[in-house]
């Protein structure tokens, strides 16, 4: 069972405001960022019996791991001598599944404001509204936005023809797809489409790709089987029919010759640009674009709002995934104490605690 995922089209558009809108989603905790640290934050909150919704601007969970190095090996995760970014994210999604978090993907948190009752109003770029008892900012180095392709003819195309996000394989069936880019994301998109029987070409300015060796070998195998067509060159013009539907892309090869590549769908991966975004306007104390936190609780200058992972700053800070896991653990404990000040808080172990094992689904509810 995987966490529930909602795209902007699947979430209700609620008008903003500080009141308790009938359509606002009420939750124990809202986690901003679905990277490894954000996902582990969900797990630690689940152990405190605090339920979560998660918002991320990217179209898939995983943050930098999924977008920047999905196939590159990671060697410093405890008990995993080596794993890829994709594998790490998949394992974390499996780990949080017992707590049924809802992932709101492809939207950015735009507003955060404290309420008189101690909770927080949060609004996203998709119009989704939340009322949360605690907020956890796990935004990494900021919200990632894809670098946009600027190409003559592109702005006249129907919106469905061009995307800077990962392709939906099922929606690409029967289409002729051109992927532009040479990084891990571009190669993964082209390979995944080809592996599902989609006619796909890959266009990059060089015949050497700045991608993980595993991805390059995967591409080369598919190309040798005639399942991916590789082109070298720079795109110069998007072509469309009278209805604004993409018909192909002209490109200039290294010798200066112009070629036309037929395509009905264009997917662009030119890298991602992190930006701080609206976070800087929320009134939180910052230094050099990082959130100041108290390192025993990882609480920001606004009580009830916590920051974990690469977005925070404190003496001795190390920007490592494993350090973010530690921060998420202490932040979850701090939030539980704040939200339930009169409840006993004892350190429990998942190996022996029946309560934790019930939360994890290892024991049925009501079992001793």
UniProtKB/Swiss-Prot annotation:
Pfam families (UniProt xref): Pyr_redox_3 (PF13738)
Entry EC number(s): 1.18.1.2
Residues annotated to bind FAD: 56, 64, 69, 109, 144, 310, 351
GO terms assigned for molecular function: ferredoxin-NADP+ reductase activity; flavin adenine dinucleotide binding; NADP binding
Disulfide pairings: none
Keyword flag Protein biosynthesis: no
Subunit structure: Homodimer.
Name under which the protein is recorded: Ferredoxin--NADP reductase
Source organism (scientific name): Leptothrix cholodnii (strain ATCC 51168 / LMG 8142 / SP-6)
């Amino acid at each position: 069972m995987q966490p529930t995922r909602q795209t902007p089209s699947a979430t209700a558009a609620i008008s903003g405001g500080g009141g308790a809108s009938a359509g606002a989603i009420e939750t124990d905790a809202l986690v901003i960022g679905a990277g490894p640290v954000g996902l582990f934050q969900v797990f630690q909150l689940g152990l405190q019996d605090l339920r979560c919704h998660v918002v991320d601007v990217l179209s898939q969970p995983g943050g930098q791991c999924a977008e920047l190095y999905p196939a590159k090996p990671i060697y410093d995760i405890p008990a995993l001598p080596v794993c890829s970014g994709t594998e790490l994210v998949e394992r974390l999604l499996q780990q949080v599944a017992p707590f049924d978090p809802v992932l709101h993907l492809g939207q950015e948190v735009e507003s955060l404001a404290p309420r008189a009752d101690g909770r927080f109003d949060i609004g996203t770029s998709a119009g989704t509204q939340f009322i949360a008892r605690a907020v956890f900012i796990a935004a990494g180095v900021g919200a990632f936005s894809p670098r946009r392709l600027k190409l003559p003819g592109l702005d006249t195309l129907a919106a469905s023809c061009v995307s800077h996000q990962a392709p939906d394989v099922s929606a690409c069936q029967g289409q002729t797809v051109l992927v532009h880019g040479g990084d891990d994301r571009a190669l993964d998109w082209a390979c995944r489409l080809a592996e599902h029987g989609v006619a796909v070409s890959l266009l990059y300015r060089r015949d050497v790709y700045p991608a993980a060796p595993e991805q390059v070998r995967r591409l080369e195998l598919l190309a040798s089987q005639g399942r991916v067509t590789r082109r070298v060159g720079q795109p110069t013009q998007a072509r469309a029919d009278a209805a604004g539907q993409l018909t192909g892309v002209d490109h200039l090869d290294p010798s200066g010759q112009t070629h036309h590549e037929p395509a009905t769908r264009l997917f662009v991966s030119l890298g991602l640009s992190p930006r701080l975004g609206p976070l800087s306007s929320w009134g939180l104390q910052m230094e050099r674009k990082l959130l100041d936190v108290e390192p025993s609780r990882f609480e920001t200058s606004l009580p009830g709002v916590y920051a974990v992972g690469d977005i925070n700053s404190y003496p001795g800070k190390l920007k490592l995934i494993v350090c973010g896991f530690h921060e998420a653990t202490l932040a979850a404990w701090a939030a539980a104490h704040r939200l339930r000040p009169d409840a006993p808080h004892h350190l429990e172990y998942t190996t022996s605690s029946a309560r934790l094992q019930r939360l994890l689904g290892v024991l049925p509810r009501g079992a001793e």
